[in-house]
Amino acid sequence: MAAALLPLSAIAQVQPTPAPVTTLPTVTVQEQAIDPNPNAEVGAPYKAKTSADTRHTRPLAETPQTIQVVTGEAIRDSGATDLKQILAAQPGITLGTGENGNAFGDRYIIRGQEARSDVFVDGLRDPGMTTRESFAIEQVEVTKGPNSSFAGRGSAGGAVNAVTKQATLDYDFTRVSAGVGTDSHHRVTLDMNKGFTDKFALRANALTSGEDVPGRSPSQRRRDGLALSGLWELNQDLSVTLDYYGLRAKDKHPDLGGYLVGTVPNRRPATGVPVYAQNSDFLNSDVDTVTARIAYRFAPDLKLTSLTRYGQSDNRYATTGASNGTVLDAANNPIGTAGVLDGGHTGWQDVKYFAHQSNLRWDKQIGSLKHEFIFGFEYTDHKVKSGNYGVTNTGATNCRVSGRNGPQAGWCITDLNGNPVSNLGDLAGRSYERRSWTRDWRVKTFALSAMDTVDLTDQWTVFGGLRADHYDLSLDTRNNQTGAITGNYGFNDTLLNGHLGVSYKINPMGMVYASYGTAQDINGGEPDTGTSSGYGGLVIHNGSAAGAKPETSQNIELGTKWNLLDDKLLATAAVFQTTKDDVMEGANYDTEGTFNTGKNRVRGIELGLAGNLTKNFQLQAGAAIMKSKVLRSAVASNVGNPLSNFADRSFTVQGKYQLTRDFSFGAVARYESSRCGGQPDTGAGYTNGMCSQPVPSFSVYDLFASYRINKHADLRLNVLNVTDKDYYTAVYRSGAFLYKGDGRAVRLTLNLDL
C-alpha cells in the first residue's frame, strides 16, 4: 500500500506552483437611449457630429464655416415646441414683425439680415410663411453668413435647415410623450419606428397639443400634426424614402402684445396692457407636403442623391392691434390717454410649390490629391397667391380720440386710469369676410452647382464651390373689389455665387480656417409683400420693376474649431464681416422706391460650445457680439445708424447635469440686448440721437429636471420663464404693437418607451 502511494506522493511534490490570479478591471456599462439621428455624436446628445446636408462632406468640426446645430435632445430638454421659439433662443438671431400673411414673427433676422424666406426643410426651401413645429424635427441647423452657393437666392445673413425624422432599419422603437401644465397646457406626441422586413421600415410621428398663451389668456394655441416616413432599401446600393408631413396650427384670439408710449427720451413699453384681441380674431396655418428621396450608389466612389417635393400651405390671419391714443372730450380737448383698437390686420396666402434637387458625389483621385466633388442640379417652382379680408365692426364706440384725419370715435381698451373696459373681447363686434386675391407671385428657378473639398496635405484643406441660378419672376396685382389688374410685372436674370474656404489642422483636435462666401437676392424676392417696397416687396422705379441689379452680400470669416474631450465637446470661435451692397430701398407700403441705393455692414464675433464637459454634464452655449452700420442710403439720415431690429449682443446657455443614474436637472439662460424697430435693410430710426422705437434688453431663465422611473418611463418637469419676466421680442416699425414673450409656465411630461 505504501509502495503504491509513493508515486502519487512524488507527483504531488513536483506539481507546479499555481499561476497568480489576474484581476481584470471593472467594466462599467452605461445605458444609453437609442438616438436614431444619424448626425448625432454618440454619447454626447447636445453635440451633432455632421450636417444633414450631404454637400458638407466633412464633419462639422472640419467645416470652415459657422454652422450652429440644435439637436433634438436639446430641443426636448428646453421645452421649446415651435421653431420660432427654438430660433429666438439662438445667438445672432432676432425676430421681426410683419404683415401680409407673416403676422407673428415667423420672420427671422440672422446677423442683421432678413431671413424669413431662407427656411429650408431637409435642404429644400420652404416658401410658405407658416407656423413651424418641432414634433417631427431631428435637429435644426443654422448656417451663418451669406450662403447662396448652397441655398440659392437670398440667405444674406444665413439660412435655417430643419432636419426631419426619417425611417431607419437600425432600430425598432415606440415613444409616447404626454404632458400637462399650467395655462391649460396639454401635449401628446408619438414617435414610432418599425422595420417590417430587412428592407422596409416605417416611421410615424404624431402630435396633438393646445394651451392658453402663458400670461396672455384668452389667447390660445393649438397644434395637430402627422409625419410619415417610409424607407425601402432594395439593395446595398439603392434606397427610396417617401415622406408625408401635415400640420394644422390654429391660434384663437392671437395676441399682438403691447405697444410703445411716450416720446424720446422716454419712449417705452406701456404697462398693464390687457389682452385686447377680438373674439373673431384668428391665425391659422394648414401645411401638407410629400417628399420622395432616392439614393443610388453607382460605384464605391460615386453616389447620387435626389429629392423631389410637392407642397402646399394655406395661411390665414385676422388680428387686432392697439396703440396709445389721446382721448378727447366732446369739445375735442385732450383729457388723457388710453389704449385704442386699430382697424385690424388681415391676410391670407395660398402657397403651392414643386422642388427637385439632385446631388452627385464623386470621390476622385487626381494626381496625388483626392477630391470630393459634388455636382448639383435644382429646379423649383414657387407660387404664392394672397389677399386680405374685409372687416366689419358692429360694436358701439366708447371714446373719442385724436386720429390721423382729426378727431374720431374709437374703441378704448382702457379707461383714463388704465383699467380694462368690460366685454373687451367683443368691444368692436368685429367680423371678417375673405376677399379675392390681390397678389399673384411666382418664381421659377433652375440652378447648377459644383463643389469640391480636397486635402492638399495632411494639414491643409481647401473647400470651394460655385452656383448659378437662373430665375423667372412674375407678379400680378389687382384691386380685389373691382377685379381690375393694377400691375403686371416680370423679369428674369442669372445669379452667380460662390464660396471658398481653407483650413489648417493644428493637431488632430483643432484647426483654424478662413472662408469667403457670397449671396444675391432679387427685386421682389419676398412672396408675402407684393409691391410694398418698405417690407421687402417689389420695388418699382420710374414705373418699371425691371433693370435693378441683384442685392449682393459678401462675407469674410476667420475661425477656429476644436474637438475636445475624446470628441465629445466642440468649441468654436469666429470673427466675421458681412457687407451687403446694392440694396433696394423703399418706404412702408409705397410701390415706388430706389434701385440699388443702399449698403450696410455687420461685423462681429461668435462663440460656441456643444457637447459634454464631463461624462455627467452636457452643455450647449453660444454668444454673438456684433455691430452694424448703414454705409449708404437714399435717405441721408440713415447713414451711420445701426440696422433695424438688430441686437448687437446675445447669448444662450443650456446645461444639464446627471446627478444620479435616474435624476438629472438643468437650466436655460438667454440674453438679448436692446434694439430699434424699423423696416428691413434700413437704418434704425433715431430722434435727437436716441432710438425712436426701442425694444428693451431682456434676460430669461428656464429650469428643467428629469427622473427615470424605470427603463421604460421617465418624467420631465419644465419651468419656463421662471421669474415671470415681462419681455418683448419684436416691435412694429411705428411702435404700434410690441410682441410679448410668454409668461411663466410649468409643464410636466411623462415619456414612455414601449
Protein language model annotation of sequence segments:
Residues 25-171, 558:
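Acidic, small-polar-rich N-terminal luminal/periplasmic segments of exported/outer-membrane proteins
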Residues 209-214, 222, 226-297, 310-351, ...:
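Acidic/polar loop-and-plug regions of large Gram-negative outer-membrane beta-barrel proteins
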Residues 231-235, 351, 370-372, 376-382, ...:
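Structural signature of Gram-negative outer-membrane beta-barrels, strongest in the C-terminal barrel
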Residues 248-263, 383-385, 472, 503-557, ...:
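Surface-exposed extracellular loop regions of Gram-negative outer-membrane beta-barrel proteins
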Residues 295-299, 303-309, 313-319, 513, ...:
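Membrane-embedded beta-barrel scaffold of Gram-negative outer-membrane proteins
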Residues 674-680, 706-754:
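C-terminal beta-signal and adjacent terminal beta-strands/loops
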